[in-house]
Amino acid sequence: MLKMESTQQMASSIINSSFEAAVVAATSTLELMGIQYDYNEVYTRVKSKFDFVMDDSGVKNNLMGKAATIDQALNGKFSSSIRNRNWMTDSKTVARLDEDVNKLRLLLSSKGIDQKMRVLNACFNVKRVPGKSSSVIKCTRLMKDKIERGEVEVDDTFVEERMEIDTIDWKSRYDQLERRFESLKQRVNEKYNNWVIKARKVNENMNSLQNVISQQQAHINELQIYNNKLERDLQSKIGSVISSIEWYLRSMELSDDIKSDIEQQLNSIDHINPVNAFDDFESILRNLISDYDRIFIMFKGLLQQSNYTYTYE
C-alpha cells in the first residue's frame, strides 16, 4: 500500500518558506535603513534564531505532529486522530490552553503590547491593493462577532490635528530601490546561471549514460545472438552424433537386445538442452564402461578356469 506523507511534506515546505521569508524581510529592512550587511552572516543568524524559536516553542513539532496525524488518517489509521480529538475535548486540556493564553497576554503586556493593540490586531487585517498605493481594511471573524454582540460603538467626535508633512527625498529613495533591484537581479542571474550549468552537466551525464546503456545493450544482443547460434550448433552436433552412433550400431554383429537397449539410451538423450544432453552422454558412457568392465571380468575368470594367463600389449 502506498504510504501518503503529503501533509507532512506540505508542513515542512511551509516552515522552510517561512524561514526564507524571514531572511528576505531582515535583509530588506536593513537595505531600507541603509545599513551595510553581510548576507551570509544575516542568513546564518536568522537561521539559528529561527530554528531555536521553532524548536524551543514547540511550534515545529506541533505542526509536524498534526500533519503526521492527518497522513495517518489518510492512510486509514485513525487511532492518533481519535486521541487528538479526545485530548482537545478534555476539560483539563481546555484549562491548560486557557492558562497558556493568559500567560501570553501577560507576556505581551510586559513587552509593551497593550490590550488596545492586541484587540485591534485581532479585529482587522490590511490587504494591499495591487497597482495602487491604497489598501483595504478587512474585518476578521472576531470583529464580526463583536458587531453581532453589540460590542462595537461609533465615535462621532473628531479631533482635528495639524498634519506635518515631511519633505521626502524621492531621488534618493529611487536610487536606493534601483540599487536594491540591481542587487536582487544580479543574485537571481547568478543562481539562474548556476542552475543552467548544473542542468547542462546533468544532461551531458544522462546522454553519456544513455550511450553506455545502448552500447551495453548492443553487446548483450550480440552475445544473445551468438549464444543462440552456439546452442543451435550444439543441438545439430548432438543430433549428428546420435545418428552416427545409431548407424554404426546397426553395422555391428551385436544381438538385437543389446542394440535395442543402446538405441533406447540414445533416444533418451535431450536434443533441446545441450547441458542435459552432455549429462545423458555421460550416463551412456558410464554404462558402456561398466558393461565392458563386467565382460572383462567374465573373460578373465574363464581364462583362469582354463589355466590360461593374459598380458596387456
From Swiss-Prot:
Region (Interaction with host ZC3H7B), start-end ranges: 170-234
The organism's place on the tree of life at top rank: Viruses
Broad class of the protein's primary localization: host cell
Dimerization, as annotated region: 150-206
Keyword terms of this UniProt record: Coiled coil, Host cytoplasm, Host-virus interaction, RNA-binding, Translation regulation
Subcellular location: Host cytoplasm
Region described as Interaction with host EIF4G1: spans on this chain: 208-313
Protein's GO biological process: regulation of translation
Function: Plays an important role in stimulating the translation of viral mRNAs. These mRNAs are capped but not polyadenylated, instead terminating in a conserved sequence 'GACC' at the 3' that is recognized by NSP3, which competes with host PABPC1 for EIF4G1 binding. The interaction between NSP3 and host EIF4G1 stabilizes the EIF4E-EIF4G1 interaction, thereby facilitating the initiation of capped mRNA translation.
Subunit comment: Homodimer. Interacts (via the coiled-coil region) with host ZC3H7B (via LD motif). Interacts with host EIF4G1.
Record's protein name: Non-structural protein 3
